[in-house]
Amino acid sequence: MYKFRSKDMSHVFTPIKLNLALHVVGQRADGYHLIESLVYFSLSGDYLHYEPCESDQFVLTGPFAKELISHPDNLVVRARDFMHKTFPEGAHPTFFRLVKTLPVASGIGGGSGDAAGVISILRQQWNLDCPFEKLAKMSLVLGADVPMCLFALEYHQPLLVKGIGQEIIQLKEACSLAIVLVNHGQEISTQAVFKALDKRHHPSLKIDPIALKSVDSLVEALQETRNDLFSPALKMAPQLTQVLSILDECGSLFSRMSGTGATCFGIFKNQQTAQQAALLIKSMHPNWFVKSIMTLGTI
């Protein structure tokens, strides 16, 4: 089993976010796109460690640290500064160490999960008297995926997310899924993908909550859904087709790109078959990011 939050919240494995379905249903006057998405999570992402200290410090390590260093807009630092600014009366200097194990700009919410980890840790460490839902809503300023990642850390459930990420519905009866993640190594800009959309008003996401209760019924229901961002992402990263084909060939029951890419996922019958597929794909493509995970679920 994956390690969840410790009781003293001094460290956390941050959420991996998976958009099993993602429909773009409109665009606001301010340019933000409106989405409807079925989102599953696994608490097996980056490792975030906290300690109190004399002055704010941040250390970045891990296999994908180099890629993140070149991104000046680090979400761990932004989330820390957000908490300092929002709760100055309870704030204290922090030391954070992030072990970056997830690819950067890969469509699985790595940075947003890191930000959510910072907020969750500091909410407890500073003993803040702020309702969770209010804090989650406030965190939207850090990015559309941050509130949903906070919900994953707090409630350990899949979600239905709407709007620009602020409308969150908990799915309290959903099975856990055995998933294999595959990323061929190309970063894809979220902004560029949305900008390249041919149209911004697609049909709404409709999925029967009963379908979430078993792997087979969920896979069947997903056949009637989409990721509307796949088409523009494919133009930027043609290798996505190969990644999806390999997942299918290795026994995936359903394969799709998550978010704006480039990470793709495959749903497998059980954890054992997922782990076997991950080993096979890694042996064929040793330079790819490949990871077998189990998602959060209540069944």
Swiss-Prot record:
Reactions catalysed according to its record: 4-CDP-2-C-methyl-D-erythritol + ATP = 4-CDP-2-C-methyl-D-erythritol 2-phosphate + ADP + H(+)
Active site residues according to the UniProt entry: 17, 145
Homology family: Belongs to the GHMP kinase family. IspE subfamily.
Function: Catalyzes the phosphorylation of the position 2 hydroxy group of 4-diphosphocytidyl-2C-methyl-D-erythritol.
UniProt keyword annotations, A-Z: ATP-binding, Isoprene biosynthesis, Kinase, Nucleotide-binding, Transferase
Gene name per UniProt: ispE
Superkingdom: Bacteria
Organism of origin: Bartonella tribocorum (strain CIP 105476 / IBS 506)
Stated name of the protein: 4-diphosphocytidyl-2-C-methyl-D-erythritol kinase
Gene3D superfamilies reported for this sequence: 3.30.230.10, GHMP kinase, C-terminal domain
EC number from the UniProt entry: 2.7.1.148
